[in-house]
Structure formats: C-alpha cells, structure tokens
C-alpha cells in the first residue's frame, strides 16, 4: 500500500473516531487507532493531528469532556482555499457584508484591501467573522456584491 493511501486511511479513521465523541484523552485516541491496525501511531502524532484538523475538547451528551471536530465552524486546514472560509455574502444599498468562519475575516479583508479601488472597493472593515465592504463612488453596491461573489465562487 502506498504511503499516501496509508495516510488517507489514518485520517479517515481519526476523523471517524472523533465523531464518536467518547475519547477524553490523546492516549485513548492512540489506543483506538492501534486497535484499527495503525501500529506506528503515538501520542505526539495524535496531538499534531488534533491541531491540524482543529479538534477541540467539549462536553458530549453525557457531559464528559471529549475531543471532537467542530465541522459546523468551518475550521480551515493548511490546504483550504480562502473561498471555503466564506460562509455568506450579502448586501444592502450601502455595504457588502461577508460572514466568514471564526477568525477568518482579517485574512479575507486583507485580500480585499489589496484589490482596492481598481476593483471598486473604497474600504474594508473586519471583525472576527464579519467584513463590511464599501464601494467607490463609481461602483454600485450591486456591482461590488457580484464581483465579491465571483471572487469567492459564492452563489446565492
């Protein structure tokens, strides 16, 4: 079996284990992976995988602290394109608003700021997960909205 195939199997098993929401320690995750035939797994590797996939400790239905993957948060990985961080794009008569995954607004705002007036952007303000974009006098909000949607492959 190729190394990349082994890695894919490991990642799939790791994510499946975390979906069970019953493992409270990294040691328990190591044991579960070893039980599935991943003999070369250790706590250090599990720790790196938890970080890479954005795993967090939270309480499960039994009120136990367990590791899980916060899929609904849209946590980016090291290979995620920026467009995956954009959750929603909307506008009114004055602004275009982008809602992102937690913590992603600053990165996307920086990209938009770099495009600047040539793309019809007068200014950008970003919080943690929300971005306000103001169009220039020569660009309508609707045009800017369409441009932003195209940039991030966002469809309404």
From Swiss-Prot:
Subcellular localization, as worded in the UniProt entry: Cytoplasm
GO cellular component labels: cytoplasm
- Name the predominant localization: cytoplasm
Q: Which UniProt keywords apply?
A: Amino-acid biosynthesis, Arginine biosynthesis, Cytoplasm, DNA-binding, Repressor, Transcription, Transcription regulation
A GO molecular function annotation here is: DNA binding
List the InterPro entries hit by this protein, alphabetically.
Arg_repress, Arg_repress_C, Arg_repress_C_sf, Arg_repress_DNA-bd, WH-like_DNA-bd_sf, WH_DNA-bd_sf
**According to its UniProt record, which protein family does this protein belong to?**
Belongs to the ArgR family.
> Briefly, what is this protein's role?
Regulates arginine biosynthesis genes.
Protein name from the UniProt record: Arginine repressor
Organism of this sequence: Photobacterium profundum (strain SS9)
Q: Which gene encodes it?
A: argR
């Amino acid at each position: 079996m190729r190394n990349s195939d082994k890695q894919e199997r490991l990642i799939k098993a790791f994510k499946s284990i975390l979906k069970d929401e019953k493992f409270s320690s990294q040691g328990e995750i190591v044991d579960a992976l070893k039980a599935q035939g991943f003999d070369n797994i250790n706590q250090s590797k599990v720790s790196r995988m938890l970080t890479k996939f954005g795993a967090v400790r939270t309480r499960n239905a039994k009120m136990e602290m367990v590791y899980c993957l916060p899929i609904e948060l849209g946590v980016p990985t090291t290979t995620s394109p920026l467009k995956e961080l954009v959750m929603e794009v909307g506008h009114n008569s004055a602004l275009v608003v982008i809602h992102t995954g937690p913590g992603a607004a600053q990165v996307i705002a920086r990209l938009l700021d770099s495009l600047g007036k040539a793309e019809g952007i007068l200014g950008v303000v970003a919080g943690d997960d929300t971005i306000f974009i103001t169009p220039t006098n020569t660009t309508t909000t609707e045009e800017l909205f369409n441009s932003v949607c195209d940039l991030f492959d966002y469809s309404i």
